[in-house]
């Protein structure tokens, strides 16, 4: 079963790092990926319909046009849906979307996620990850969970204090487990995924986010993940910074 998936947070529209679609679309059209999982893609919906290449893909759009995750697939879509996370602090939350995709007579379940960031911390993101992995138990075949997981909390120190202040994260939302309290958030996130049988295809110490336009990888944060279960780990290629996130191409 040979196929490829491109995961990418394309826009960065929430903050000062907003990226113009005119820079993003050519990269998508040149990509050889069979499946795209895109975050912050709410402005892309109309562009897809008029793109010579992307308009030929099968699409999973959220029901609410303000929701920002999209899945595009060259392969047939068997089923799809949305996951609304339990309310944490907001009345409007990020959601995850999923699709069952038929690839060479096998059904692959793909989740495209964008986890919460403002006013929440590792505790809440782990709850959201567990919520997705619990849903994934319904599918016995290959499962992929990818997206911008916003694992933003660095090792204990001034950098962590800065991130907490910037994203309004209280100490109560941090991990209190002594083994992980002083570590970067990515370590407890990976352990939680592995306990449910998932492997991460991206190097744990890779940085996937920067401050644009200067491309400063402050704190060397790994926000983007590619978790797999019941399928071989893919080869990963990290793209250059066109948005504030690297694109991630996974070849199976």
Stretches with model-predicted labels:
Residues 1-52:
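N-terminal, active-site-proximal structural segment of metallo-dependent hydrolase catalytic domains
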Residues 2-12, 81, 107-117, 146:
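Active-site-proximal beta-strand elements of phosphoester/diester hydrolases
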Residues 7-21, 83-91, 116-121:
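Acidic/histidine-rich helix-loop elements
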Residues 13-15, 42-47, 118-121, 150-156, ...:
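Active-site environment of divalent metal-dependent phosphoester hydrolases
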Residues 35-116, 238-239:
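Structured beta-strand-rich core segments of catalytic domains in phosphoester-bond hydrolases
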Residues 36-40, 61, 144-148, 199-203:
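Active-site neighborhood of phospho(di)ester-bond hydrolases with catalytic His/Asp-centered motifs
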Residues 58-73, 88-93, 122, 153-160, ...:
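Active site of divalent-metal-dependent phosphoester/diester hydrolases
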Residues 99-102, 109, 125-155:
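His/acidic metal-ligating clusters that form di-metal
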């Amino acid at each position: 079963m040979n196929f490829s998936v491109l995961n990418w947070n394309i826009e960065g529209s929430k903050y000062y790092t907003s990226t113009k679609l005119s820079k993003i679309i050519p990269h998508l059209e040149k990509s050889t990926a069979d499946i795209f999982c895109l975050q912050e893609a709410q402005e892309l919906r109309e562009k897809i319909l008029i793109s010579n290449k992307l308009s030929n893909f099968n699409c999973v759009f959220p029901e609410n046009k303000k929701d920002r995750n999209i899945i595009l697939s060259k392969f047939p879509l068997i089923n799809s849906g949305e996951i609304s996370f339990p309310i944490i602090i907001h009345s409007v939350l990020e959601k995850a979307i999923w699709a069952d995709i038929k690839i060479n007579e096998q059904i692959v379940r793909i989740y495209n996620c964008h986890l919460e960031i403002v006013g929440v911390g590792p505790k809440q993101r782990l709850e959201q990850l567990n919520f997705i992995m619990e849903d994934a138990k319904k599918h016995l075949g290959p499962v992929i969970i990818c997206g911008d997981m916003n694992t933003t909390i660095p090792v204990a120190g001034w950098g962590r204090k800065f991130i907490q202040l910037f994203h309004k994260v209280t100490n109560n939302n941090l991990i209190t487990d002594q083994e992980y309290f002083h570590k970067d958030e990515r370590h407890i996130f990976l352990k939680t995924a592995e306990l449910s049988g998932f492997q991460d295809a991206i190097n744990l110490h890779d940085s996937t986010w920067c401050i644009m336009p200067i491309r400063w990888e402050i704190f060397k944060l790994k926000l983007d993940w590619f978790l797999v279960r019941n399928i071989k780990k893919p080869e990963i290629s990290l793209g250059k910074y066109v948005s504030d996130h690297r694109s991630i191409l996974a070849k199976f």
